[in-house]
């Protein structure tokens, strides 16, 4: 190959096979896509070692993508169950899967995940460090942290979430500006703790050029984590969050100089009125890099329903610039999600993403809704099911209701507006009282 990364190829005017696939999916000219990649406005996470990957683009002008989190924990160490979740995510066409395993030796699961998955795979190397070395966090060296990141890249992870912006300056800002919920990012809290316990700079910030060496070698996209994302609505858009975002913007430019693709991770918990502003701030400070948000979750009082609170926030965020939504399940803040929780989270995120694509005017987004409108006017139930985000549920609800007429449902029966308008415009009687049709 005459290039090292997708960004390097784009800058050189080389069209890669990944670009061709993404351009076709997005119904856009591949040269336009290449231009966006060269400027960092779009990323195609595509590790050279992820052979089963069906690439997707994330960023400006493209369909909003969703990510599914899964992985092994100490309380739920069940590789087979997590692999079932992987298959569920693939079957439901999630564009990305993150392995957030945080206990024991995780490489076996990670390698199986990457081998079987056509979806983009992301990981968080710091979660793996304690188990990888069987060491307490404070005893892990900066060099060892980098080695774990390289192992994940070697395994085939398409993007690595690294909380590089939690440096000493950001930490000092956090200390001066107390929060109601402190730091709620798992990776961010681990790095902050390591820095405090060792009185040292963030190893990934201090050795950022070495991290870029790894990303360039394997064509790994760097997902710059938001250690200071707000964990409750009271902490949103505060000094720590903005200080870190400024640092991420500076790191983004350094990565691009090395032809390493970047995604910026974002909030978090915030009220509806702050979402648009946050999207604009990120795009400004981080130079238009793709934005990957968790939610945002728009109220703190709905445990068991946070797939809804996050879908509300996600739809608004993606309408105003977010490019990539991390799903949230009903189990958020309560437990590790099961398969049913996963499905609910994926559906909610897909609804949010599609609603935003409609609002943004993404090419082809309205085609599905227009097709559904036609199917409904035609009372073509089979076509309605096929077009549904959750075909199984739509079909089951219809079958369980046992409607007396094929033209209507149990809500309106023969008073169905669609049925009656069809009949009267065709010159037919409504037959409201007879059961024969």
Curated annotation (Swiss-Prot):
Biochemical pathway: Cofactor biosynthesis; thiamine diphosphate biosynthesis
InterPro entries: ThiC, ThiC/Bza_core_dom, ThiC/BzaA/B
GO terms for biological process, alphabetical: thiamine biosynthetic process; thiamine diphosphate biosynthetic process
MF GO annotations: 4 iron, 4 sulfur cluster binding; carbon-carbon lyase activity; zinc ion binding
Binding residue positions for Zn(2+): 269, 333
Family: Belongs to the ThiC family.
Name the UniProt record assigns to this protein: Phosphomethylpyrimidine synthase
Naturally occurring in which organism (per UniProt): Clostridium botulinum (strain 657 / Type Ba4)
């Amino acid at each position: 190959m005459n290039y090292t990364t997708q960004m390097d190829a784009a800058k050189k005017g080389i069209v890669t096979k990944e670009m061709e696939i993404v351009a076709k999916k997005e119904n856009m000219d591949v040269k336009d896509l290449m231009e966006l990649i060269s400027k960092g406005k779009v990323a195609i996470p595509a590790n050279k070692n992820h052979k089963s990957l069906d690439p997707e683009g994330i960023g400006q002008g493209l369909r909003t993508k969703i990510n599914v989190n899964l992985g092994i924990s100490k309380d739920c160490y069940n590789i087979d169950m997590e692999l079932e979740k992987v298959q569920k995510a693939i079957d439901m066409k999630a564009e990305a899967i993150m392995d957030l395993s945080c206990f024991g030796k995780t490489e076996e699961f990670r390698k199986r995940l990457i081998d079987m998955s056509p979806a983009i795979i992301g990981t968080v190397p710091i979660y793996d460090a304690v188990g990888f070395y069987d060491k307490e966090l404070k005893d892990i060296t900066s060099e060892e942290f980098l080695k774990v990141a390289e192992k994940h890249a070697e395994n085939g992870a398409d993007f690595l979430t690294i909380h590089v912006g939690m440096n000493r300056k950001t930490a000092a800002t956090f200390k001066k500006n107390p929060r109601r919920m402190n730091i709620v990012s798992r990776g961010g809290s681990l790095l902050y703790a390591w820095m405090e316990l060792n009185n040292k700079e963030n190893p990934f910030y201090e050795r950022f050029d070495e991290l870029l060496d790894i990303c360039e070698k394997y064509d790994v996209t760097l997902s710059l984590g938001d250690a200071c994302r707000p964990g409750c609505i009271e902490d949103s858009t505060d000094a720590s969050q903005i200080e870190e975002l400024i640092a991420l913007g500076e790191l983004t430019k350094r990565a691009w100089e090395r032809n390493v693709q970047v995604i910026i991770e974002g909030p978090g918990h915030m009220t509806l009125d702050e979402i648009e502003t946050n999207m604009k701030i990120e795009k400004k400070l981080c130079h238009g890099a793709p934005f990957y948000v968790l939610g945002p979750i728009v109220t703190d009082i709905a445990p068991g329903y946070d797939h809804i609170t996050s879908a509300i926030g996600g739809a608004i965020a993606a309408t105003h610039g977010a490019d990539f939504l991390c799903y949230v399940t009903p189990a958020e803040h309560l437990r590790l999600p099961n398969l049913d929780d996963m499905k609910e989270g994926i559906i909610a995120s897909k609804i949010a993403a599609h609603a935003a694509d409609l609002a943004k005017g993404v090419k082809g987004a309205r085609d599905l809704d227009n097709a559904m409108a036609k199917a409904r006017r035609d009372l073509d139930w089979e076509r309605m099911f096929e077009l549904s985000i959750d075909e199984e549920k739509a079909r089951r609800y219809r079958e369980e209701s046992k409607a007396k007429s094929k033209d209507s449902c149990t809500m309106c029966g023969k008073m169905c507006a669609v049925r009656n308008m069809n009949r009267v415009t065709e010159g037919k009687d409504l037959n409201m009282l007879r059961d024969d049709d």
